[in-house]
């Protein structure tokens, strides 16, 4: 026992002899916890270069609490005001009915003095005045309190914004965001940093800066431009239809509309490149379907149906109107039913005859009202399910000699 006590005392002496800067703190459960004290150098460094994050955090927390208190007070005042106004109106109407009834019941006697009569009638006029004065005074007081709280709220918000800006300046927040945007491999972090920098730029310049994916904006802009250019072309073609007595089945769009919608048409061509077909059996194209009514109608407008070819889609075999015999080898169009691109069989030979530099190649995006058929084509379309507005889009590749020979 003595040896054990000596060993225990020895360990205690050794532990007490060691110098340790840690302070012993007893917790609520009775366990000892040691907290290491900071050295002199670390204290000086923190006193000179520290950001005082604890002070900022405490002040921002106090500001948020005060702001929440002010907002709750304004909300309670608004609820109290609504309840008071509702109750005041209800009680005013109730007591006014009682006052009117009392005045009618007590002034039936004709022998009453005018002073007594006026005294009995007075509550009927006095109650509305009292209610109005009470309403105006209390509402004015509440509005004054609301203005004061709103001013306090604005001051708190301005103070919080100033504290946050000061903290950002001390911690080089925007410089950090710029470095993240430049060198961080994570695209999400880059996008967040770009949003922060754009918001700062907008706040400094007073402009609204939108930061987003450009790929999401380009399709919408293309659709709007396509709708606008399509509307211009449709109006122009309707005017041409009303002025001309003899219409041709193919109308060339002018160069301005072609150049203005080049990007949209290229997009439409890329979307339909996977569905490209040749004209369906052009040698057996009988433009007329054998009905004498359609022949008579075509002859009345001055067009011989035997000199026209029917445009049959190579994919869905649908009838898409008529084309002249001399224009048929050069026609390329989109089928409005299946959106397939139909080209002539000998397009390669024609491309050898007329080089690509001299040909006015235009790839049009599928749009309505690109081809205006004559009345013969409308009569031919009697057995066809295609309505008048869903005519095929025509793309011509005509040499200069062919343009001089064929009428527009």
Curated annotation (Swiss-Prot):
UniProt feature coiled coil, ranges: none
Disulfide bridge map: none
Source organism per UniProt: Arabidopsis thaliana (Mouse-ear cress)
An MF annotation (GO) of this entry: ubiquitin protein ligase activity
GO CC terms, sorted: endoplasmic reticulum
Any Pfam family hit: Zn_ribbon_10
Biased composition (Acidic residues): 394-408
Low complexity bias locations: 369-379
Disordered, as annotated region: 218-265, 367-408
TM segment ranges: none
Classification lineage: Eukaryota, Viridiplantae, Streptophyta, Embryophyta, Tracheophyta
Alphabetical list of InterPro entries matching this protein: Lnp, Lunapark_Znf
Any GO BP annotation: endoplasmic reticulum tubular network organization
Descriptive protein name: Uncharacterized protein At2g24330
Family classification: To C.elegans C05E11.1.
């Amino acid at each position: 026992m003595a040896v054990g006590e000596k060993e225990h005392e020895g360990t205690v002496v050794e532990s007490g002899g060691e110098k340790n800067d840690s302070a012993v703190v007893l917790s609520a459960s009775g366990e000892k916890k040691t907290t290491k004290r900071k050295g002199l150098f670390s204290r000086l460094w923190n006193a000179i270069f520290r950001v005082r994050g604890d002070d900022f955090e405490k002040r921002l927390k106090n500001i948020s609490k005060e702001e929440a208190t002010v907002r709750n007070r304004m909300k309670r005042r608004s609820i109290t005001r609504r309840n008071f106004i509702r109750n005041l109106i209800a009680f005013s109407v109730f007591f006014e009915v009682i006052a009117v009834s009392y005045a009618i019941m007590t002034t039936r006697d004709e022998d009453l003095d005018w002073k007594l009569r006026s005294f009995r009638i007075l509550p009927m006029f006095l109650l509305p005045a009292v209610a109005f004065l009470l309403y105006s005074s209390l509402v004015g007081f509440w509005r004054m309190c609301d203005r004061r709280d709103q001013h306090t709220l604005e001051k708190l918000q301005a103070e919080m914004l100033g504290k946050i800006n000061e903290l950002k300046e001390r911690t080089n927040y925007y410089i950090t965001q710029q470095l993240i945007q430049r060198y961080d491999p994570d695209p999400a972090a880059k996008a967040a940093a770009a949003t922060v920098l754009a918001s700062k730029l907008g706040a400094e310049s007073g402009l609204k800066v939108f930061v987003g994916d450009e790929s999401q904006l380009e399709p919408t802009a293309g659709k709007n431009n396509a709708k606008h250019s399509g509307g211009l072309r449709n109006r122009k073609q309707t005017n041409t239809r009303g002025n001309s007595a003899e219409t041709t089945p193919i109308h060339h769009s002018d160069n301005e509309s072609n150049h203005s919608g080049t990007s949209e048409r290229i997009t439409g061509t890329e979307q339909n490149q996977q569905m490209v077909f040749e004209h369906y059996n052009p040698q057996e194209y009988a433009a007329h379907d054998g009905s004498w009514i359609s022949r008579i109608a075509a002859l009345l407008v001055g067009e011989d149906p035997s000199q026209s070819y029917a445009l049959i889609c190579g994919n869905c075999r649908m009838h898409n109107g008529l084309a002249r015999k001399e224009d048929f080898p050069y026609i390329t169009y989109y089928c409005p039913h299946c959106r397939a691109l139909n080209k002539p069989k000998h397009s390669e030979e024609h491309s050898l005859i007329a080089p690509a530099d001299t040909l006015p190649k235009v790839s049009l995006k599928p749009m309505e009202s690109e081809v205006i058929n004559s009345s013969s084509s409308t009569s031919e379309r009697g057995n066809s399910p295609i309505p008048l507005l869903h005519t095929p889009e025509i793309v011509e590749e005509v040499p200069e000699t062919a343009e001089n020979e064929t009428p527009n």
